[in-house]
Amino acid sequence: PFANGKGFDGCDLAPANTYPVYDGASDDLRTLVADLNACLKANGEKPIKNVKRGKMARLIAHYKSQFNDEPMAVDFSAAGAQAWYEKGRQFYWAKRGQLNFSCADCHVTNSGNSVRGDVLSAGLGHGVGFPVYRTKWSMSGKPWGTTHRRYGGCNKQVRASPFKAQGTEYKALEYYEAIMNTGVPLKVPSQRQ
């Protein structure tokens, strides 16, 4: 509970399987991270600054786990929502970095193949297990990570500069992947190499 005696259950959080949520009034996406921080702030608590790992990742895991087995059902019927979907789609398929890879190069064209001993995951299902406990991250003592932490890591691996977590690019990508996973059930948390 918060210092005021209330908790997250008193906040306007959407079901986990419907995030990100398009907000027509602001023409922006509400991510679970942003909604959790807004709830903290509205109740006199400090927002969590590190939105890529640690406390935020564990909080997301707890909230999303309550919706395990619920199929992804993100609404993108509004015109503004479709524009966000298109931004995410363009990001997913655009080549970037010194290696000139897109998200699709790894997770569509080469899914199932091995890179440096790791099998590349298929794009279908990305996001439904996040946040994740990752073995590689545990070596540094910070094993939990959000989707945006992983996006940043992917960008670095193709030798592109990562974008800001919760920035426009990664929010659009998260939205695109969530819509592409319509019908795929949530399974949180998950473990990755």
What are these regions (language model features)?
Residues 33, 37, 60, 82-85, ...:
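Hydrophobic core segments within long, regular secondary-structure runs in both alpha-
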Residues 2-58, 65-69, 94-193:
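Electron-transfer interface patches adjacent to heme c in soluble/periplasmic c-type cytochromes
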Residues 67-96:
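Electrostatic cytochrome c docking/interface patches
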